[in-house]
């Protein structure tokens, strides 16, 4: 039956629909809602903060919405003695320094050379962090557009995956290849998870492959154009039968006072666990919030059948108003806020790395 299902999916994938006009994209804005849009209409959706999957190259996924597998996530933290020393290694100044470099590219657009160069820089930083760990690797994930996604893998005793992700691309909503420093959206999340990775691999058990589960850190390409990179990765994982037991998304981490714990298109059990991590390992205030359909990359994991959670910089509506413009600069951000998000990532990743799931 699995073979027949795979063949059916392959047949659907080959039978890609023809756009009404050249250059149009097929977008999905709800579980059963798809339509063709022009490039201008698509960028208007970006500017109006309308979430969507671009499924032009994956039309078969329009009707695929796998219910995430249910896991019994821990009800208590078990590794405070190991995690708290790692939190002391998180440096707001280091996050800021990395973000100054990352937001210095003219833009990080998914289909521009500067987006390729910024991805290469991320890969170099990740390689410097995990390069001496036996069995660990950092790799480019190539797509049908210029910018690759970047993936760092720190193996554990099993092939079950605990994933942390952030999109690396930026966009100018009025002119996609125009100036887009993207300091908050999403340089902040990208550098937050890089800092967390740096702290995590300083732990001898993590670096020694003693964790029960494998850790993966992802920097996605093409989020702004319809969650493109994360769709590719998680749909491929689903097709290959990989088991992602948890995914935490970090998209915008540098603005506002009260974090927003996103409760739609996410896994309620994993979200409950994430709140416990916030309470234990950070000093952050947070409130529940909703961001709508396909608002960020956790939705790609959720759609592919993997439990996901998303902690945002603020309650939706109280977030950074300068995104998708040349004004999304580092001066508007709080490095200490990003450091709190990094603490969340470290606690989340460490506790689940050693959890029996």
Swiss-Prot record:
Stretches the record annotates as Disordered: 169-188
Binding sites annotated in the UniProt record for Zn(2+) 2: 185, 224, 324
InterPro entries: M28_fam, Peptidase_M28
Biological process (GO), any one: proteolysis
The keyword Endoplasmic reticulum appears for this protein: no
Signal peptide: 1-15
Keywords carried by this UniProt record: Aminopeptidase, Disulfide bond, Glycoprotein, Hydrolase, Metal-binding, Protease, Secreted, Signal, Virulence, Zinc
Residues that coordinate or bind Zn(2+) 1: 167, 185, 251
Enzyme Commission number(s): 3.4.11.-
One annotated Gene Ontology cellular component of this protein: extracellular region
Compartmental location: Secreted
Alphabetized SUPFAM superfamilies for the sequence: Zn-dependent exopeptidases (SSF53187)
Glycosylation sites per record: 76, 186, 269
Major location category of this protein: secreted
Cofactor: Zn(2+)
Cystine connections: 291-295
Biological role stated in the UniProt entry: Probable extracellular aminopeptidase which contributes to pathogenicity.
The family this protein is said to belong to: Belongs to the peptidase M28 family. M28E subfamily.
Protein name per its UniProtKB record: Probable leucine aminopeptidase ARB_00576
Species of the source: Arthroderma benhamiae (strain ATCC MYA-4681 / CBS 112371)
